[in-house]
From Swiss-Prot:
InterPro entries: DnaQ, Exonuclease_RNaseT/DNA_pol3, PAS, PAS-like_dom_sf, RNaseH-like_sf, RNaseH_sf. Residues 511-704 are annotated as: DNA-polymerase III epsilon chain-like. In the C-terminal section; belongs to the DNA polymerase III epsilon chain family. One of its GO terms (biological process) is DNA replication proofreading. Its EC number is 2.7.7.7. It catalyses: DNA(n) + a 2'-deoxyribonucleoside 5'-triphosphate = DNA(n+1) + diphosphate. DNA polymerase III contains a core (composed of alpha, epsilon and theta chains) that associates with a tau subunit. This core dimerizes to form the POLIII' complex. PolIII' associates with the gamma complex (composed of gamma, delta, delta', psi and chi chains) and with the beta chain to form the complete DNA polymerase III complex. Residues 139-192 form the PAS domain. It comes from the Bacteria. This is DNA polymerase III subunit epsilon-like protein.
Length: 704
């Protein structure tokens, strides 16, 4: 190993050690020469004593000088180098501390001036870039909003079937306890066979615009999804196409398939239940009207009775099937859940736009299942047909059992049934002549009738089969970033798998995590009470992929621990146990490098529960304590507070000593350490691992 690869402090130590050895060698040589020159054997003891004293004095002086050099030159230079490297490679903008380099002459002030100039230049550049990128950021936000609310799930995958993009609808469609994550295999969420076959078909075709329709099922709950796959064309070359990724659009057709199966079953039952009595009736009627039929009155009476019985069976079957048809018909039409207040406002606006007078909507806090556009057109049509002679019109939406009642009230003359039927037979203004009020009622499997109220008021009643109250969810499920699109298109250009040790750091997927516990001693019965984690993919933290949950430790939480992290026994009383949480966390961290601040402490708690969890936490691990020592030197403070302060990261007071707050702070520190590591030539995982192993003693001291 060349001297240039050794640390500055070690090289200075070796220099003074060599100086000490040289002095001792010169002293010994001088004493030996003097003794032989004197040629008096009795003087040997004097030479030995004198040489020993002189040697110790030399070693002491050189040791003191080395200690002063180490404390006032080597360490400050190492600290100064780490600070400069942090400022040149990361976004640290705090002033450089000159006090540590007070014995370095003009070096520390010069370094501080360089850092200040760098900050000013960087700020000016940032402002210029910010001005130029504001418009692009707005366009990006608009595009993300658009893609987050398209009515289908959208996945973008690499040729190796790793996720590069997904939107909010895709998260809902894929379902399951484990949300999608960037750089995860799509086969974790969808059964692979249909996707592999469709991908192979598209790769084999020569048409760059070809698409493949397929049916696939979710791994979590077996829902059937209709999908369309299209390759991302990057050229006509066959090899380029083979390396291209693909877009997969998803739509849940489980309800459509159930509705289709229900219709098929109803039709089969219809023919089965009608065929036999109809055939029997045909035979009986043929016998009764035949000229050579039975002349005996008793026989003819029996035939007529049998015909009546078959007719009764037929009528009963028709009525039963009609009722089932009415009950199922609403499921055969795409109906959406719409707020009653929005429905009332839409009717009011349409009535006003058509000049049909005033209408007061009075709605309950309900979600209504209906075809909003056609139902609004129907109610507006009825208001218009009521005319100006009927005053004080009011639209009420009331809860009615499992459904709702839409009531159109007015003061004035009643509506005759014949007039109402005429109104319902008229076409509605929806752009299709065949859409009438009666058809809208049929789609919703409902009817409309008039009722008389008190004091000269009347109303038309229209019940809806399905509605539900709107209220706060007593157990809301937090969504880290609602309806968000999550993507990293750089993953498309990433090469294939390589050995972990040779993989560049910015190509790895990291899961940064932290735990809160009942105490500091896993061997003494302390347990985890909270786990939080975030994912870093392609060198950036994915905002929408967060793991954060309380854990029921199955034991009391000491007051001293609660004073640190704020977690009480009441907060974890209904939380899941470590067995369930551990399995979920293992899935979240699957295939990633684990990162933590003082990782041995957190991992010890998890590894002691591996048998209970049923999973082994054998992921590769990096520790930000050791990475800090690599960048800033072992002599610096390496607590999380010291590291974040050194890197210019602010931890909000309310987030301090919480699992998620410390996790986010550790992740930000880790991201700022990566450029500093690369500047030292540590670009691969193996190189970093080799370097951090030199600081193993520091980790042992921290956990002693």
């Amino acid at each position: 190993m060349g001297l240039a690869r050794l640390s500055l402090r070690l090289r200075i130590f070796l220099f003074f050690a060599a100086l000490a050895m040289g002095n001792l060698a010169a002293l010994v040589a001088g004493l030996v020469f003097g003794f032989h020159k004197l040629a008096r054997p009795e003087a040997l003891s004097g030479f030995v004593i004198g040489g020993t004293v002189a040697g110790l004095v030399i070693l002491g002086l050189i040791g003191v000088v080395w200690a002063l050099f180490d404390a006032n030159l080597a360490r400050p230079i190492e600290r100064l180098a780490g600070s400069i490297r942090a400022r040149t490679q990361t976004a640290v903008d705090s002033a450089l501390d000159e006090s540590a380099g007070r014995y370095l002459g003009d070096l520390a002030p010069a370094a501080a001036a360089i850092a200040q100039h760098l900050n000013e230049t960087r700020s000016a550049l940032t402002e210029a870039v910010q001005r130029e990128t504001t418009r692009l950021a707005r366009e990006k936000d608009r595009l993300e909003t658009l893609l987050s609310d398209v009515p289908v799930g959208v996945l973008l995958c690499t040729a190796d079937h790793a996720l590069v993009f997904y939107n909010g609808q895709a998260v809902d469609l894929l379902g399951g306890a484990h949300a999608p994550g960037l750089d995860r295999r799509v086969f974790d969420y969808l059964h692979p066979a249909p996707i592999r076959h469709a991908h192979a078909r598209l790769l084999a075709t020569a048409d760059p615009d070809a698409a493949s329709d397929l049916l696939c099922a979710t791994v979590a709950d077996g829902r059937t999804l209709a999908a369309r796959m299209r390759l991302i064309s990057e050229g006509e070359d066959h090899q380029v196409r083979r390396l291209a990724g693909y877009v997969l659009t998803l739509r849940d057709v489980s309800a459509d398939l159930r509705a289709h199966a229900g219709r098929e079953a109803l039709m089969d039952e219809l023919f089965d239940r009608i065929r036999r009595p109809a055939a029997a009736l045909q035979s009986l009627m043929g016998v009764l009207i035949a000229e050579d039929g039975p002349a005996d009155p008793q026989a003819r009476a029996q035939l007529r009775e049998a015909a009546r019985a078959e007719a009764g069976h037929l009528a009963q079957a028709i009525h039963s099937l009609h009722d089932r048809h009415e009950a199922m018909r609403a499921d055969w039409w795409p109906l959406a859940m719409i707020r009653a207040s929005d429905f009332g406002a839409a009717v009011q606006a349409r009535v006003a736009a058509e000049g049909a007078g005033d209408l007061l909507p009075v709605t309950a806090a309900l979600l209504l299942r209906l075809e909003g556009f056609e139902m609004v057109a129907l109610i507006a049509h009825l208001v218009r047909r009521l005319g100006p002679g009927r005053a004080e019109k009011r639209l009420e939406v009331l809860e009615d059992g499992a459904g709702a009642l839409i009531a159109l009230e007015w003061r004035g003359a009643a509506v005759a049934i014949a007039d109402l039927e005429l109104w319902l037979s008229e076409p509605l203004d929806v752009g299709q002549a065949e859409v009438t009020g009666r058809r809208v009622l049929s789609v919703h499997a409902t009817d409309l009738w008039p009722e008389r109220l008190h004091e000269g008021r009347h109303r038309l009643c229209l019940p809806l089969r399905e509605a539900r109250r709107i209220g706060p969810d007593p157990h809301p499920v937090p969504r880290p970033v609602p309806r968000q699109v999550v993507y990293d298109f750089d993953l498309l250009g990433r090469g294939g798998e390589s050995a972990l040790a040779e993989t560049p750091l910015d190509k790895l997927t990291f899961v940064v995590f932290d735990t809160e516990t009942t105490g500091l001693f896993p061997t003494g019965g302390d347990e985890i009470v909270q786990i939080a984690a975030v994912r870093i993919v392609n060198g950036r933290r994915v905002a929408g992929e967060v793991f954060d949950t309380l854990v029921n430790p199955g034991r009391p939480i000491p007051a001293a621990s609660t004073a640190v992290h704020g977690i009480t026994e009441a907060m974890v009383a209904t939380a899941p146990a470590i067995a369930e949480v551990g399995r979920r966390f293992h899935k979240f961290a699957e295939g990633a490098v684990l990162v933590a601040h003082n990782a041995p402490f957190d991992l010890e708690f998890l590894r002691r529960k591996e048998l209970l969890i049923g999973k082994n936490f054998d992921n590769p691990v990096l520790d930000t304590v050791l990475l800090s020592a690599v960048v800033f030197g072992a002599a610096e403070g390496h607590s999380l507070d010291a590291l974040t302060h050194r890197l210019g990261i602010t931890i909000p007071e309310e987030a301090r000593h919480t699992a998620l707050g410390d996790t986010v702070a550790t992740a930000e520190a880790f991201l700022r350490l990566l450029p500093a590591l690369k500047a030292r030539g540590l670009t691969t995982f193996g190189a970093v691992l080799t370097e951090v192993r030199k600081h193993g003693r520091l980790m042992r001291d921290m956990n002693a």
